[in-house]
Amino acid sequence: MGPEASCYFYENVIAHTKAEKDQEHIDMVLLSHASMPDRTKAIRTGDDTHLINLLCTDARTLETLGASNIAITCNTSHYFYKHIQNAVKIPVINMIQESVNYAVHKYDNVKRVGIMATDGTIGSKIYHKACRKAGVTPVQPSEERQADVMSLIYDDIKAGKSGDRAKF
């Protein structure tokens, strides 16, 4: 969810790194391209050429700066995963696949996985495909509840506010 997701990711890397001094932390290059066009809009309209070019340029920039792999903290951007991966020689971590794999391996006999995401992510079915590939049933919110999820993401979190938990 924009800069918030990047911040959360970085905080988690720090929290899970065993380090007693600065030099023991993981070297990272952070790229927050806040002016990136809206991914959901690009998926819905099919007008995605400019967005794909920007995503691939960012990936090549990270590679040039010495990154050994790339983590994209935006679920919706993973709709363009193949384009991004094809633009670089280093691995791009597929957050969708990793998330589904985590759920399947973390919880014994999991049969269903709930998906709360933008309309672009839901509409693209990227989580649905990963769930089915892993042998679990994807579950998405009703249209009414999906509107609440979108409001939480766009009106709250992307606007720099803390999420309204009452919407859930």
Give each language-model segment a name.
Residues 1-168:
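Non-catalytic structural scaffold of enzyme domains
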